[in-house]
Each structure stands twice: as C-alpha cells, then as structure tokens.
Amino acid sequence: MGELAPITKIIPVLVVTAFMVIGMMLHQTARQKQILGVLWLQAMRRLITHLQRHRGLSAGVLGGEQALEENLSEVRKQVFKDIDAINGVGEWMNQHADWLSIVEHWTRLIGSMHRLSVSDAIHQHTLLIKNVLALVDEIAVEHHLHDVPGGSQWRDLLTLAEYVGQMRALGTAIATVANHQDEIAVNKTREDLQELSQEILTSLDSPNYRAGIDGDNLQRILDFLSYVDAQLLKDAPGVEASGFYAEATKTLDQLFKRFDQQLSQVHQRLAH
C-alpha cells in the first residue's frame, strides 16, 4: 500500500493538468475559428464593395453612359476574383447553400444584364447584396465574433455603406437618364433617393450607429447627403453620371476604410 501512496497523490495532479491542457486546446481552437471568421468577413467586404460598384456602373451604362463601360468590365472581373478568394478561405463556405445561391444569382445576373432595365438591374444587385449581408451576419454568429470586444460595431458601417451604395446607383441613374429627358424615371428615382437619405439620417440618430462611426465619416456622410440634395433633387441634375459616381465613391471608400480598421482591431485582439 505504501508504494501506491505516491501514485494516488500524482493522479489528481495529472487529471487537473489534463483538463488544463484540454481547456487550452479548446480555447485555441475557438480562437482559430474566430480568426477564420474575420478572414471571411474581410473577403466578403471586398465582394460587397465590388458588387456595389458594379451596381452603380451598370445603372450608368444601361442608361446610356457608355463612358463607364470599361470600368464596369474591370469591376465585373474583380467580382469573380473575389468569389474565388472567398472559396479559397475554407471548406465551410464552399458547401454553404446560401453562398452557392449567391454565386448562382451573380452568374444569372451577368448573363441577363443586357436585357434588364436600369431599375431592374439596380433591384437585382440590391437583392444580391442583401443576401451577402445576411451571410455576413451568419458568419459572425457561427464564428462567435460578437463575443470579441468591439466585435460588432463594424456591422452598422456595412449597413450605412449599403445605403450610400444604393444612393450612388440611383444618383448615377438620374444623371444618366436625365440626359435622355425621361422625366418620369427621374422623378421616381428622386423619391427613392429621398427615402434613402432619410433612412441614413434616422440611422445616424441611433447610439449604436454613432458608436461605430468616427467624426470624419459622419461629416462626410452629411456632406454627401447635402451634395445629393443640391445636385440631384433640385430641378435638373447639375452633375454628370461619371462625376456623381466618383463623388459617391469617395464617401463609400472612407466608410470601408473605417470598417477595415475596426475589423483589423478585432483580428489583433484575437491574435494576441
């Protein structure tokens, strides 16, 4: 019995050590899963950016602004590269039904673009982006990113960016269609622009949105709304399609820059 005493003392220590090791391994596995989620979000952000650009350029080209055709072709190629990059992050996405549906929707959209009206093209792009944003939310939940401090403020930036992205497409359409004297289309699109402008202002009144946006971006958005009001909502549009598209893109690029900063901070917290 005396020989067993040292062993019986060691066993509890070994058990505790084993549990500690298992706990550390589980924690590390969970952390790796969160980091993988961040990588997917970063890739999805690039896809959203290019889908939004494609929507705006399509609105111009289908409305008759052929000067935007070359840019549209380049952005289209970039979307396909984004899809390949997302597929390369991991197997989870390759087998995800919603992701496969998004890719299929994009392929159908490209194949039918030449037959779509401006409004239908904008609608299809917006529906596609809405589905990508829903998948972004699922990625965040599935990979427990909301458990990370500051791990959800970036999401409101995507919502704001999509509002601005829709305004870019509608504004480009107005500036293009106006050149062809389609007053009915211009008036309808103006109403849509006014609704989006109000959506943005309402969102900016929310403390959650204010927490994630910096002062420079807040002012930039407000300035952009004033620009839209002055150039597109007063009498005849006072800006060309390419000029409006470029101005809206500046606002969007800064919002996405802020998004990248916030997601980078999440990644840094997980990596240390």
Task: Please provide the spans of the model-predicted regions.
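Hydrophobic alpha-helical segments
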Residues: G2-H272
